[in-house]
Structures are given as structure tokens and as C-alpha cells.
UniProtKB/Swiss-Prot annotation:
Spans traversing the lipid bilayer: none
Keywords: Isomerase, Metal-binding, Zinc
EC id: 5.3.1.17
NCBIfam families xrefs: PRK00924.1
Protein name: 4-deoxy-L-threo-5-hexosulose-uronate ketol-isomerase
Length: 278
């Protein structure tokens, strides 16, 4: 497991390109037939991917020892969104079907977690976020139709997009984890602009549906000290609460957002005018 320490904004603004990438970019989210995880000290979120390319991928019991508990979800909850072919997730001996662009929430205490594909010619790919939890809520799946869609932006400002809120209080209860997916329409390039911060939670963006020769220029940093990280397909960026999180691509793309912290109200944001960015 890759462990990332938290970082102060005063330190972050002094970093060069390599330093910014080392602290904030998760380059290798997926590995075939493996569970890849990055542990951030920022709100103790775990970011990762399970890719059952040729065989099922099990959450190993050894992860519990790394976390100082009996098993990974002994004091955590987990959300996963499938960006690949149809698949399934087994929890406590029960198998749950999770189709393409569908999600599953696994409550605190879940054991025997296994990720699988229906067809290895088109394997599932599960992007996951995992956060500390204090209460056990039921495991359940969420379809795209159930994900509280909201369309925002305008083609004239190159940011027409639909937000699918899979794991939010209006859909199901969680301790603190929120997750969703934003799909940009063809010709739209910007996400989350005008941008914002949120003092009461952190966020991770995971970008996908990008061609091999495409990229997203992800903006981060304090509003008056912005920096950028170049992100390619199926890579993630960690955003502390003090940082903006926005981006512009060389083509339209999709991204998954995940948040952990003390407030789950989706609109709890500190908005920043474009004129105030530096």
C-alpha cells in the first residue's frame, strides 16, 4: 500500500512538478488481477482499484494487520464504481451484480470482499474509495438511474456536464463517504469552473474515458496560489480541504469524485470567483 502524508498549503506552493506529482497524483490506480491501494493521511481516505482481468480479486486478510484491525472494513466503509464491463462484488458470502457505471456501497464490518467479472473478455474495473466509519450501514448497489442525476453548465462555456450522485445522503446513508461520477458532453472540456474549496472535507478526482494521447490539466492549490498537474487516463488526484480542484481536458472525459470529512451536504462549498484566481 502506497502511503501519502498530509501536506500544508505553505509547503505545497513551493513544490516543483515532481513534488506536486509525488504528493497529489495517483498514477497507478489499476493493475491486472490485483488490488491497488493508496492510503492518504488526509481524512484517512484510501483510494484504489480492483481489476479482475482474468480471475476474481479478493481483499486480502493481511490488509487488516496493516490497518491495525482484524480486517479492512472493521472500522471503515467502502464505495466502488465499476468503469469496466459487467461484474460482481461478493460481501459476507452474498454476491451483488454491479454493471457498467454502477456502484456498490459496503458498510462497516463487511468481510470476505471479492471483486469479479462476468466476462473476462470485457472485464470489470472497480474504482474504490474507503473511509473511516463508526456505524454499520447496509451494503447495497446503486444503478445509474438511481444516482440522482443533475445536469449543469453550458456548451458556450465548454462545461456542459451531468453529475451522477451515487453515494450521497439523498440516495443512501453512510458515515462520511460520498461518491459520484461526472460525465462531460462532447465538446465540453472544463469541470468545476467556477471552482470551490470545502473546508470541512477533502476530495479525490479520478479521471477516465481519456484517449492515450489526451490529458487533463488538473488545477490545485490555494485560490491565490494555483498549480497544475497533468493527468492521463485512469489516474487520480488527491485534494486537501484547502485546495481548489478543477480541470480542463484536451477532449471530453468522465471523472469520479469521492469525498470524506465531517459534512456530507453536497452543496457545502466555498465558492471562488474566476476573477479571484491566481
Amino acid at each position: 500500500m502506497d502511503v501519502r502524508q498530509g501536506i500544508h498549503s505553505e509547503h505545497a506552493k513551493a513544490l516543483d512538478t515532481a513534488g506536486l506529482r509525488r504528493h497529489f497524483l495517483v498514477e497507478n490506480v489499476f493493475a491486472p488481477d490485483a488490488l491497488s491501494l493508496t492510503y492518504s493521511h488526509i481524512d484517512r481516505i484510501i483510494v484504489g482499484g480492483a481489476w479482475p482481468a482474468t480471475r476474481p480479486v479478493e481483499v486480502p486478510a493481511s490488509l487488516g494487520a496493516e490497518m491495525g484491525v482484524s480486517h479492512l472494513l472493521a472500522r471503515r466503509e467502502l464505495g466502488a464504481i465499476n468503469i469496466g464491463g459487467p461484474g460482481w462484488v461478493e460481501v459476507d458470502g452474498q454476491r451483488h451484480a454491479v454493471g457498467t457505471e454502477e456502484a456498490i456501497y459496503i458498510g462497516q464490518g463487511g468481510q470476505g470482499v471479492v471483486f469479479g467479472s462476468d466476462d473476462h473478455a470485457r472485464p470489470a474495473k472497480f474504482y474504490l474509495n474507503c473511509a473511516p466509519a463508526h456505524t454499520a450501514y447496509p451494503t447495497r448497489t446503486i444503478t445509474l438511474a438511481q444516482a440522482s442525476p443533475e445536469t449543469l453548465g453550458d456548451a458556450a462555456t465548454s462545461n456542459r456536464r451531468t453529475i451522477y450522485k451515487f453515494i450521497v445522503p439523498d440516495v443512501l446513508p453512510t458515515c462520511q463517504l460520498s461518491m459520484g461520477m461526472t460525465k462531460l458532453e462532447p465538446g465540453s472540456l472544463w469541470n468545476t469552473m467556477p471552482c470551490h474549496t470545502h473546508e470541512r472535507r477533502m476530495e479525490v478526482y479520478f479521471y477516465f474515458n481519456l484517449a492515450a494521447d489526451a490529458a487533463v490539466f488538473h488545477l490545485l492549490g490555494e485560490p491565490g496560489e494555483t498549480r497544475h498537474v497533468v493527468v492521463h487516463n485512469e489516474q487520480a488526484v488527491i485534494s486537501p480541504s484547502w485546495s481548489i480542484h478543477s480541470g480542463v481536458g484536451t477532449q471530453a472525459y468522465t471523472f469520479i469524485w469521492g469525498m470524506a470529512g465531517e459534512n456530507q451536504v453536497f452543496k457545502d462549498m466555498d465558492h471562488i470567483a474566476v476573477a479571484d484566481l491566481r
